[in-house]
Amino acid sequence: RAYIGIHIADINQELAKKLALNGVEGVLITDVLKDGAAKKAGIESYDVLISINDVEVNSVSQLHEQIIKFSPGDEIICQIKRNGILQTIEIELES
């Protein structure tokens, strides 16, 4: 099973306001696991994950639906927002 190495949360209006996010798109990365695939790729806590391989993820369940399509060793392209700036990060999934 593929593993990205993050803890995530759905973004609701209250959380978006608290974190000064523009809207509720994506999922909030609440923690990046030490030595995990996401950490190695440069993902940080409080980044907002917008999409994986051009498929939008707007809930924890949508993210899980995307990740299970992949195997350890596969590379995925993630769009994230950090401080309001969109970035593209490539992550090699682990097991």
Locate the predicted segments by residue.
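C-terminal recognition in membrane/secretory proteostasis and scaffolding
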Residues: 1-95
